[in-house]
C-alpha cells in the first residue's frame, strides 16, 4: 500500500528526523521542502515567490513518485490549509492513501534548544520567542476527513515506531 504522508509541526519538533526514521523503516521517499527552498536562494526571488515555487516543486516531485507507486513523505510544517488540501488532492485518483503525522513538543525550552543547536539551512529559523511558540506550536492545519496521528517528539528515543508503522499500514486510518 502506497501512501502520501504529510509531516506537520513547529520547526524544531523533529519532523525531519522522524520522516527520515520512517523512510528507513518503510522505504518511503522523503521530500524536504526546506532543502528545495534553500537550493533556490541564489536566484533573487522574493520570499513569497520562493515559498510558492518550493511548494510547487515539492508537490510535483511527490506526484511523480506517487504515480510510480512509491510512498512519499512531505516534510513541511503544515501551517496553511491549502498545503494540506493539496496533499489530499494529490492522492485523488491514485492508489496512495493520505496520511498525516503531527510532531508535537509541548516544551518551548526543548524546541528552542533544538533550533539553536541544529545545523540549520539558511531558510530555516534558528530561534523563536516563547510567546510565538506557545501561540503556534499546536496550530498545524489538520485534514478534515482523515485520522491524523499526533506524536510527542519531546524525547526522540521514546517514539513508538510500531504505532507509527501500524498507522501507516492501516487503510482505515487514511483515505484516497
Regions inferred by a protein language model and the residue ranges of each:
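Glycine-rich phosphate-binding loop used to anchor ATP phosphates in small-molecule kinases
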Residues: 53-94, 98
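Conserved glycine(s) of the Walker
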Residues: 14
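Hydrophobic anchor at the beta1->P-loop junction of P-loop NTPases
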Residues: 7
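The conserved Walker
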Residues: 11
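Walker A (P-loop) ATP-phosphate-binding motif of ABC ATPase nucleotide-binding domains
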Residues: 4
Amino acid at each position: 500500500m502506497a501512501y502520501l504522508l504529510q509531516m506537520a509541526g513547529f520547526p524544531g519538533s523533529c519532523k525531519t528526523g522522524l520522516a527520515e526514521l520512517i523512510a528507513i523503516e518503510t522505504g518511503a521517499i522523503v521530500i524536504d521542502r526546506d532543502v528545495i527552498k534553500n537550493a533556490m536562494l541564489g536566484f533573487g526571488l522574493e520570499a513569497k515567490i520562493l515559498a510558492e515555487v518550493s511548494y510547487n516543486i515539492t508537490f510535483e516531485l511527490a506526484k511523480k513518485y506517487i504515480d510510480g507507486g512509491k510512498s512519499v513523505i512531505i516534510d513541511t510544517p503544515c501551517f496553511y490549509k491549502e498545503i494540506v488540501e493539496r496533499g489530499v488532492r494529490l492522492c485523488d485518483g491514485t492508489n496512495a492513501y493520505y496520511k498525516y503525522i503531527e510532531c508535537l513538543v509541548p516544551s518551548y525550552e526543548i524546541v528552542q534548544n533544538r533550533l539553536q543547536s541544529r545545523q540549520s539551512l539558511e531558510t530555516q529559523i534558528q530561534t523563536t520567542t516563547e510567546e510565538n511558540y506557545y501561540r503556534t506550536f499546536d496550530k498545524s492545519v489538520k485534514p478534515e476527513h482523515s485520522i491524523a496521528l499526533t506524536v510527542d517528539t519531546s524525547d526522540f528515543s521514546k517514539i513508538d515506531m510500531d504505532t507509527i508503522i501500524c498507522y501507516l499500514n492501516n487503510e482505515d486510518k487514511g483515505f484516497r
